Amino acid sequence: PDFWKMNGLAADEMVVFSDAVHPEHQSRPAHGWFPKGQKMALKATSGRKRLNIQGALDLETFQFTFVEGEKINAQTTRQMLEKLERNNQTMTTIHVFVDNARYHHAKILQPWLDSPERRVKLHFLPAYAPHLNPIERLWGVMHDWVTHNHHYATFNRFTEAIFDFFRKTLPEKWPE
């Protein structure tokens, strides 16, 4: 992929890796210990509501930019890319590595991407290669901290926990 060739970026260029995640409001047993022969009771939630989050991660600064939407589509992709541009005013080029989801190739996104004032440049990772996208590891850490072995009685509490992770825990535990 192109990102291996980007070691010589100018100081006013940056690279981010982007992807979507859809955490579901349900109990996710991941690991635990209890005496042999005993059964473990696990609280469960009713329903399967979920959040739809599209994020972008800068591996140099660990800056995490994200948007939430009713669903992830070309509109939420554009919102996230616009937020990247707003949050990085000093950058002349923002290289964004994405997977090959249909909304990244959407016709309605192309005119916006092609406009001369755009500083975002999309780079597509190979198909079926999530292991090449470092943000996938962040999703795993989020699940370890927030969803695995946790129960949230309400969807609002679940939503708070997810956003607290991104807004508070992530910047505090993994500082610049």
Positions of the model-derived regions?
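RNase H-like polynucleotidyl transferase catalytic core
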Residues: 40-46, 114-134, 150-151
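Extended, low-complexity cationic-aromatic segments
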Residues: 1-82
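Acidic/histidine-rich, metal-coordinating catalytic segments
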Residues: 19, 81, 92-105, 128, ...
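Short, well-ordered coil/turn elements that cap or connect secondary structure elements
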Residues: 10, 59, 91, 115-119
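Short, aromatic/basic amphipathic alpha-helical patches
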Residues: 106-116
